[in-house]
């Protein structure tokens, strides 16, 4: 970004409608509370609204922070080789005024995910977990020596 530190990158990140604070706009100035106290410049993944995709040997998992949405505001669909997660809520009041939020995420499913065994759950703290087991192919997946025809 050409403007660098003049404009905080948080404005362009995936924070779903959270308000800006003084430390977002001027992160390099010390706090008025104490010169030794300073807010963290980095937020944790669980607070950020950013998704995490894990593709292990046995399982494919998507973790998504949707704490601003109720279960009725969310929809999860599988279309062909993609999973689509959509969330939308109408205007309502929060700590910073009135806000409406909407997001749409689309992820490609690996070809070896068993689509009939996919599960999706929403935890009490607003973490959506989408996971599906991977089926093992008949082909030997070890990286030992094997002939190539």
Curated annotation (Swiss-Prot):
Residues given in the record as Zn(2+) 1 binding sites: 89, 91
Pfam family, any one: HSP20
Quaternary organization: Heteropolymer composed of three CRYAA and one CRYAB subunits. Inter-subunit bridging via zinc ions enhances stability, which is crucial as there is no protein turn over in the lens. Zinc coordination is achieved at least by His-89, Glu-91 and His-96. Can also form homodimers and homotetramers (dimers of dimers) which serve as the building blocks of homooligomers.
List of residues binding Zn(2+) 2: 96
PANTHER family: ALPHA-CRYSTALLIN A CHAIN, HEAT SHOCK PROTEIN HSP-12.2-RELATED
Similarity field: Belongs to the small heat shock protein (HSP20) family.
Keyword Kinase in annotation: no
Protein location: Cytoplasm; Nucleus
Its biological purpose: Contributes to the transparency and refractive index of the lens. May act as a chaperone, preventing aggregation of various proteins under a wide range of stress conditions.
Annotated protein name in UniProt: Alpha-crystallin A chain
A single GO BP: negative regulation of apoptotic process
Domain of life: Eukaryota
GO molecular function list: metal ion binding; structural constituent of eye lens; unfolded protein binding
Assigned keywords, A-Z: Cytoplasm, Eye lens protein, Metal-binding, Nucleus, Zinc
InterPro entries with a match to the protein in the record: A-crystallin/Hsp20_dom (IPR002068), Alpha-crystallin/HSP_16 (IPR055269), Alpha-crystallin/sHSP_animal (IPR001436), Alpha-crystallin_N (IPR003090), HSP20-like_chaperone (IPR008978)
Signal peptide: none
One cellular component (GO) term of this entry: nucleus
Domain sHSP: 41-149
């Amino acid at each position: 970004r050409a403007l660098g530190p003049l404009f905080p990158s948080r404005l362009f990140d995936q924070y779903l409608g959270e308000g800006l604070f003084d430390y977002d706009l001027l992160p390099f100035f010390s706090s008025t509370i104490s010169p030794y106290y300073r807010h963290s410049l980095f937020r944790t993944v669980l607070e950020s609204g950013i998704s995490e995709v894990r593709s292990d040997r046995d399982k494919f998992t998507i973790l998504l922070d949707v704490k601003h949405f109720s279960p009725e505001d969310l929809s999860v669909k599988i279309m062909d080789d993609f999973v689509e997660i959509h969330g939308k809520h109408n205007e309502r009041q929060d700590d910073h005024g009135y806000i409406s939020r909407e997001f749409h995420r689309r992820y490609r499913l690996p070809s070896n995910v068993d689509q009939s065994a996919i599960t999706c759950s929403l935890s009490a703290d607003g973490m959506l977990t989408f996971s599906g087991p991977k089926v093992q192919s008949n082909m030997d997946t070890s990286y030992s020596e094997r002939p190539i025809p």
